[in-house]
Amino acid sequence: MFALSKVLRRTQRLRLGACSAVFSKDIQLGGERSFDSNSIASTKREAVPRFYEISSLSNRALSSSAGTKSDQEEDDLEDGFSELEGSKSGQGSTSSDEDEGKLSADEEEEEELDLIETDVSRKTVEKKQSELFKTIVSAPGLSIGSALDKWVEEGNEITRVEIAKAMLQLRRRRMYGRALQMSEWLEANKKIEMTERDYASRLDLTVKIRGLEKGEACMQKIPKSFKGEVLYRTLLANCVAAGNVKKSELVFNKMKDLGFPLSGFTCDQMLLLHKRIDRKKIADVLLLMEKENIKPSLLTYKILIDVKGATNDISGMEQILETMKDEGVELDFQTQALTARHYSGAGLKDKAEKVLKEMEGESLEANRRAFKDLLSIYASLGREDEVKRIWKICESKPYFEESLAAIQAFGKLNKVQEAEAIFEKIVKMDRRASSSTYSVLLRVYVDHKMLSKGKDLVKRMAESGCRIEATTWDALIKLYVEAGEVEKADSLLDKASKQSHTKLMMNSFMYIMDEYSKRGDVHNTEKIFLKMREAGYTSRLRQFQALMQAYINAKSPAYGMRDRLKADNIFPNKSMAAQLAQGDPFKKTAISDILD
């Protein structure tokens, strides 16, 4: 029997016996639709606890271990695991970094959510573009339906295989808006008989483009007969991706009420959630998995590897890898890449390169799937020779993701001209490059503070008819912040927020909020804090830390800050507690004591 919680205890990095339950039995989401409890017959499995009961499980199971550490050790653990900001990635992490190395609910969606025909996706993922995909990409942004009508009139046949190819290729390029328009057109024109998987894909795309609330509205319109486990799994994954704890717990409990068996996927989603929000609760989920005899999946191990690596606990990460070996779990390319990234981030160059050589195998050409990660990680190690070696192999006929990885890699190596040359090649080959292509080069300009080139690139992007998506806005906003033009970045944020098709990335707000915080500009820091809520982002410790720092830098009393934290169900870690003490308006000093 596996015991990952024991592995975590051996590394002495998780406080398993002291996790406090904060979930309510009756979670009410104000102003939101409730989920239809009659959508599927319920066969209750009482052995599976609801999510608000999970924390008490760990307290009972490990009560003897609670309180065995000193208060100082407890604080250190809490500070090290409760927030990603305390890790080596720090506050300066960008969205591109996340795309490269971190696990997310979106990263595993093709494999885990099962939204696309599995046999089709595996065979066609690296093949040439489908004709349906080409038609959709070449059409103006809001005219996908007209383009598809014309395509059918020309005698082309719409088949499941062609749809699956196009959908997969659109998703891989993050063209979610076009994919959603295709899905809606297919149903409206009765080109396919809709299945639960089709509706789940629609739900997933709706949330990605229009937000979680619109996704819930979409779910209400889906026929009850199609509201099965796949649909709820998709909703759960999107609640997790949004970092919405209450809604994630609500869906988790709803799945239990509907009689769906507790699965590895469901537990993995809760692990992903707590990896971002409250790492102390990771132990609770692992204990639940042990109690219900749910064997960890490959994603479970990846999450734990990422948690350990992000907090620079390399010995703990290696123990997780050893456990995988003992359990006979084979490392895939993604797990190897994740491990190599954390070795690189910890400055363990030799260990990182050893893993990369294992990824290459005996025949590098035969391991084409690894090229994207190899380019990125070799660049992070400063190995220009290795980046050029890998790129030379695929340069004549590169896959799209390899080209993007090469642009990033050469950018990291300060080879901006090489990055620009690859970009131009993509534009020439595709004729109509996607927003993600522009965003990657734009981020290279951001990293090198090339404001003028960045502006020209965005102008060129707009002239090409390519829609400016969230990743592009994120890079552009950061570009202005890095150039010291914070007010201009704030203006861009306002403009981007008004685009109904775009949900801005959390980092886009934080770049500006951090700058206002450094200035001690309480008014504008509070304004960005409010904008994040309006955009649908739930408050996290990270935002409150920036907000509190603004009050400290302004030497202004932060009245009611503890109550605000409590209202958002956020518990301060060690660094936040120090900020609260520093900014306490009722703080006693030696002089005040004398005056009293």
Curated annotation (Swiss-Prot):
Species classification: Eukaryota, Viridiplantae, Streptophyta, Embryophyta, Tracheophyta
Pfam families the UniProt entry points to: PPR, PPR_3
Annotated InterPro entries: Pentatricopeptide_rpt, TPR-like_helical_dom_sf
UniProt subcellular location: Mitochondrion
Annotated protein name in UniProt: Pentatricopeptide repeat-containing protein At1g80270, mitochondrial
Residues in PPR repeats: 228-262, 263-296, 297-331, 332-366, 367-397, 399-433, 434-468, 469-503, 505-539
Keyword Repeat carried by entry: yes
A GO term for molecular function: mRNA binding
UniProt organism field: Arabidopsis thaliana
Family: Belongs to the PPR family. P subfamily.
Keywords for this protein: Mitochondrion, Repeat, Transit peptide
